[in-house]
Amino acid sequence: MQPTLFIDRDGTLIDEPKTDFQIDSLEKLKLEPKVIPALLRLKAKYRFVIVSNQDGLGTDAFPQTDFDKPHNVMMALFESQGITFDEVLICPHKPEENCLCRKPKIKLLDHYIRKNLFDIDRSFVIGDRETDVQLAENLGIRAIQYDPQKMNWDLIAEKLLGETVTNCGKRPPRFAEVIRQTKETDIKVQVWLDEAGVNEIKTGVGFFDHMLDQIATHGGFRMNVQCKGDLWIDEHHTVEDTALALGQALKQAVGDKRGIARFGFVLPMDECKAECALDLSGRPWIKFNACFKRDKVGDFSTELTEHFFQSLAFSMLATLHLNVTGNNDHHKIESLFKAFGRTLRQAIRIEGNEMPSSKGVL
């Protein structure tokens, strides 16, 4: 079975007009940035299937001919660049019709399921909406939610191809798995330090999932995090215990630290200025400097940002300095997680075979 990418059309392959959400003329047809180079990189490994909801297609409000003209031009454009789609599957119904084929329902893909036409372990849904994520869950596969700023086509290709490596094949792959079970949480963390890829992260706290993904994405490694916590109380135990398990997994995956860079420092400048300095020293300590105006960002308590990094540093046995300034709490927290990921990327990179300490041990 070949790995398959089930790709949304409007808002993912091509721009979706925010006025009427219909591409019914050539004037509205616009490709998403970098989509063609990304698909050209991916086509050797994956086959492509378009899965799209087109509300009211074939009605007076959205005649079939109005749809066909820009759609056919789009398909011809992709084909002229060497990109073909095995199928184009379209639901023409409106939400109120309650059909069985509208995403996230899976009727459109029934033949793929019945005939085992896709590799469940290596296939993905790519789309810009939550319904695309839900479609992936219903199919039993993973999703990548497209966003032109945060998860663009360049990043999608990098994740799916796992092109970022830190080991270069010189040593056995650095992998660790940690299972942590308490009365409050049940957590499983897996990290692959020498390969990038799609991270599967589900803690039940959406903003926290996104932040953990930033660590792996900017750290240049792959990780899976599954957590079932006592969220009916609050997210404190989930965040704290995930940090402890992740820190333990990173520590185990790094191993005896022979040959690693050990140190990392990064200072990203955007709307927020985030500084991070890291030493995989074996001596846990943290200096954290950040002020937040809001109590929560989404479903995540801002006060848990410091607690997460403190728990992570002590579990990793690392020395960590973090500082951020800015106006938007969402961006400040995100910049800290990104900065930590970039710094960790430097520190875990293998540069030789020597122990990076005059003591001969870390």
From Swiss-Prot:
Catalytic activity: D-erythro-1-(imidazol-4-yl)glycerol 3-phosphate = 3-(imidazol-4-yl)-2-oxopropyl phosphate + H2O; L-histidinol phosphate + H2O = L-histidinol + phosphate
Cofactor entry: Mg(2+); Zn(2+)
Chain spans, region Histidinol-phosphatase: 1-173
GO molecular function: histidinol-phosphatase activity; imidazoleglycerol-phosphate dehydratase activity; metal ion binding
Subcellular location: Cytoplasm
Catalytic machinery residues: 8, 10
KW Coiled coil (keyword) present: no
Keyword line: Amino-acid biosynthesis, Cytoplasm, Histidine biosynthesis, Hydrolase, Lyase, Magnesium, Metal-binding, Multifunctional enzyme, Zinc
Entry's transmembrane regions: none
Binding site for Zn(2+): 91, 93, 99, 101
SUPFAM superfamilies in UniProt: HAD-like, Ribosomal protein S5 domain 2-like
BP term (GO), one: L-histidine biosynthetic process
Major localization listed first in the record, in broad terms: cytoplasm
PANTHER family: IMIDAZOLEGLYCEROL-PHOSPHATE DEHYDRATASE (PTHR23133:SF2), IMIDAZOLEGLYCEROL-PHOSPHATE DEHYDRATASE HIS7 (PTHR23133)
Protein's recorded name: Histidine biosynthesis bifunctional protein HisB
Organism the protein comes from: Haemophilus influenzae (strain ATCC 51907 / DSM 11121 / KW20 / Rd)
Taxonomic path: Bacteria, Pseudomonadati, Pseudomonadota, Gammaproteobacteria, Pasteurellales
Gene that this polypeptide is encoded by: hisB
